[in-house]
């Protein structure tokens, strides 16, 4: 139920940066504070990028005052037009990686169980979060001492195209809900594995609607049947979902149940 705002955790961010400087993982230069990437040997483990790939794929600015091209900003100076806070390095603001690490530590404690995000955030954002967190209060030799599990979701496209306001193809849940029940919308979204992309089209939502209706039909026809009446080869939903939250696999099994429902006895469906 916590929805932290970055501006409410500036002291925690400054505290994190000070600790990194004291432990020689970061340095101050021209009003900036930067994390020195070569000091953290596990950098790149999450994204599985080598040194050259890290530099090529990094979004960080290559400034002349950096000790290393891969070094990223923890704190940067603010102009009069930009938001800023007093700090040991002058008036400035935190880098966005710093914000996430500080708020996670303060609100959840370390380590926390699951860290989610889009797959585009694996590098450099999540890689940087791990580095600065493991070099402070978490364990430097154990990347999972910050977050135990990382879940990166794919993107939703529309009929093969990127969903974007500029293309005018944005579909809002509230609009879908005018024609489809929430269960149908959720099932449609779960039809693709969370790590993969989902191409949204009418076929996806129609298939989900059809499956939901069929499952309710089966349920209504099985009312009054006790557990002992049911097939011993029950659907093991938990085991399927334990396999990296394999929702498409579970939906496949639900479809198989619907096929079995056409057998002479509805009991055979379970």
Predicted features along the sequence, with ranges:
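Divalent metal-dependent hydrolysis catalytic cores, especially in the metallo-beta-lactamase
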Residues: 1-6
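Aromatic- and histidine-enriched alpha-helix N-cap/loop-to-helix transition segments
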Residues: 8, 95-99, 245, 249-252
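Alpha-helical recognition segments enriched in aromatics with Gly/Pro capping
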Residues: 10-221
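Helix-loop elements that line ligand-binding/catalytic pockets
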Residues: 198-200, 204-208, 212-260
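Single conserved hydrophobic/aromatic residue that forms the stacking wall/gate
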Residues: 261-270
């Amino acid at each position: 139920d916590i929805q932290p705002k970055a501006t409410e955790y500036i002291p925690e961010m400054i505290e994190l940066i000070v600790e990194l400087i004291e432990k020689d993982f970061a340095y101050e230069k021209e009003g900036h504070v930067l994390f020195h990437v070569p000091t953290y040997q596990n950098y790149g483990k999450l994204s599985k990028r080598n040194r050259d790939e890290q530099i090529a794929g990094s979004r960080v600015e290559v400034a002349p005052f950096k000790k290393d091209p891969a070094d990223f900003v923890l704190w940067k100076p603010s102009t009069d037009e930009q938001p800023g806070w007093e700090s040991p390095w002058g008036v400035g603001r935190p880098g966005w990686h710093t914000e996430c690490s500080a708020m996670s530590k303060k609100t959840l404690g370390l380590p926390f169980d699951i860290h989610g995000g889009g797959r585009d955030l694996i590098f450099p954002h999540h890689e940087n979060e791990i580095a600065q967190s493991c070099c402070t209060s978490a364990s430097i030799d154990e990347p999972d001492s910050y977050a135990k599990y990382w879940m990166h979701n794919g993107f939703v496209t529309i009929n093969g195209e990127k969903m974007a306001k500029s293309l005018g193809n944005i579909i809002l849940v509230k609009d879908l809900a005018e024609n489809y029940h929430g269960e149908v919308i959720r099932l449609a979204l779960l039809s693709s594995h969370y790590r993969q992309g989902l191409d949204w089209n009418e076929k996806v939502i129609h298939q989900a609607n059809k499956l939901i209706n069929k499952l309710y039909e089966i349920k209504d026809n099985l009312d009054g049947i006790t557990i002992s009446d049911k097939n011993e080869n029950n659907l093991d939903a938990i085991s399927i979902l334990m396999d990296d939250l394999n929702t498409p696999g579970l939906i496949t099994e639900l479809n198989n149940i619907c096929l079995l429902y056409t057998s002479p006895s509805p009991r055979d469906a379970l």
